[in-house]
């Protein structure tokens, strides 16, 4: 990926000497339920180009490479790792869910008026009722 237009959900891809037009990229969901995880500059992607015209291509996925290896090495682990050090991971063998953000970050869980906020300074619970057992 050479460039990202996040507002239009399009990327330009450098394929050898060719810089493509702005191309759409695939996502997991794009209907009433939607996901967003845009490809970034420097990311290696796979293009499907009907008729071989790269300017009509669609980015259908990304590939690991030496600069950006897989973030896990087990089929039991589903893991997303961000460049700032944040990690979201589920290990189905251990039944363990982990969410980690770097120092200075915040984790917020909300359901209606109830909220849990976690920062370096502590944990704040806000709710109509709090039961401690």
Protein language model regions, located:
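Exposed beta-strand/loop interface patches that mediate assembly or binding
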Residues: 1-95
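Intrinsic-disorder/coil detector with helix-boundary
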Residues: 102-133
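Conserved, well-structured core segments that form or line functional sites
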Residues: 87-89, 94-99, 106-108, 115
